[in-house]
Amino acid sequence: MANGSGKPKPAFFIAVLVVVAGLVGIAFYRWNAKKAETAQSVGSGKIDMGSIKQQAGGGSGSSQAENPDPNSITTVKEYAFEPASRLPEVPGTADYAALGKPRVVKFAVNVWAGWAPIIWANQGSKPKKMWKDGKGGEFQVELVLADNPVDMGNTFAAGKVHIGWATVDMLPLVVNRMSRDPRTMPRVFQQIDWSNGGDGIVVRESIKSVSDLRGKNVVLAQNSPSHYFLLNMLLNGGVQPSEVHMDFTKDAFQAAAAFNQDKKYSAVVSWSPDIYNLTKTGMGNRMLVSTQTANRLIADVWFARADFARDNPEIIEGLVRGILEADEDLKTDASKQAVGKLMDEFYSLPAGPGLTMLGDAHWTNYAENRDFFLNQNNPTNFERTYNTAFLLYKAIRSVDTKVPFDQIMDFSVIKKLGSEPRFAEQKNEYEFKFTPTTGLDVNVESAVLTKTVTINFFPNSFDLHKQIPAKSGTGEVPYDPNVDYTIEEIAKLAGQFGAARIQISGHTDASMRGVADESLVRELSTRRANAVKEELVNKYKMNPNQFVVAGYGWDKPADPKDPDNHAKNRRVEIKVVPAEAQ
């Protein structure tokens, strides 16, 4: 493409420019795509807890903020699939220690109150008592103490124990290690308990809220329930993990010792009894939050090797049934005294601590297990807890590839036992009993667990779903388009923090200051707060006594530096206040 003088024609330069522009465009596109990928990749940029919660909620990959399912989140909607249709096939011959004659199942546990039911069912740790399997055959159980989860995992993978223990938040880490051999992949059959005060964050007296941990040193055990607990508290409180300096120890007990010895640590995440020893009078420490408040956050479960579960379904049924029956037996004081002594002996404790630690966990009965495994709409079910843990650990680069929840969760035995009246008639007993209170009774400002959630209102309105003319001129749109999502998020928080008060405070703008009657202004703000409470109680069947409602009129602008921002001031604020502050 040249003219008579041998020089390129103008069209040549145009073509070159087009090619160069195209190459630059491709490079720019790929750079932006890489940048976006990096921003969303694990461990880089800010971690968005709201996004994690949306993805964890039984997600289908939809870009919608809410599940289009018309049922409310507390409506019982059970999974329609059968576990066998989702669980991967287990190839090859078994690779675990032979059971022998009589059959002896080796069941790993750690030093924890949650294992009281199986210790009671087995009458100690030794294989003495005869259990009945699903077909009436006999077997025995040997409880193996394995406190270190890494060592326990190695023993489990080697086939030296048939049953392992974990909290659901640990499972993404467990399956990440076990996925190389499908025979060792965990099959989770039963929830043992909810941590109910046994895990906690202890801080120095100067730390008043989660946000005060910014820039501070925290000591804890890495990739443990303590780690998951802290990540949840930080992100729900609006603090990025990168804003906190974390030092890791081998286990929670070493973390407590480090906190006690070194004043550079402003907080420690540990568990009972250390969290209570550290908060004794005169030590200068306090409990920021424990699973007494976040009482549906840490769930203990047991799991079998996939090859063992394949070969011994009747033993699995016998274990589930025996533990559930022991839950019922342990409701008497006499049985609690007796199991406390068995725990002292098994855990090599002096006389007494076994009984004392029983209150650290709530043993889950049949109804609570069914709700945990089968109720798709339960905001704190197995699926959501597992997915949330995976996404949190992926965000800090502890895991990469996800194993779907339904490839490790097997609710077949729980579902089968529902045909027996003694189980089917059980009720969920894990409900916190709130006493009515007022906004002035709760010290909200001193200890708020989560960042403040806000809903905005139209002038002179307390209608949550107020419609206004669309800017396009056609039809109407919600004044606050996020209100339904916000209400659902509050319901999820209230579920996780089952023993926390939910403070709902209503506010107005000050545009009529000096003109309007102040009592009318305060009444409007109170009505706004009550509208939020009523929506939660009516839509999600929540305990009305969990909510503390107050109307502040125009006394508390959203931003004291910008008190005349009327649109921001017409609002309701929702805060989660721990039981420890009540």
Placement of each model-derived feature along the sequence:
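Short, glycine-/small- and polar/acidic-enriched structural segments
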Residues: 45-48, 64-251, 266-272, 288-290, ...
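Second-shell loop/turn segments in exported
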Residues: 105-106, 142, 215-220, 264, ...
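Pocket-lining segment of extracytoplasmic ligand-binding domains
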Residues: 168-170, 178-179, 242-247, 252-351
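Secondary-structure end/capping motifs
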Residues: 310-401
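Periplasmic peptidoglycan-binding/anchoring modules of Gram-negative envelope and division proteins
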Residues: 446, 457, 463-506, 533-537, ...
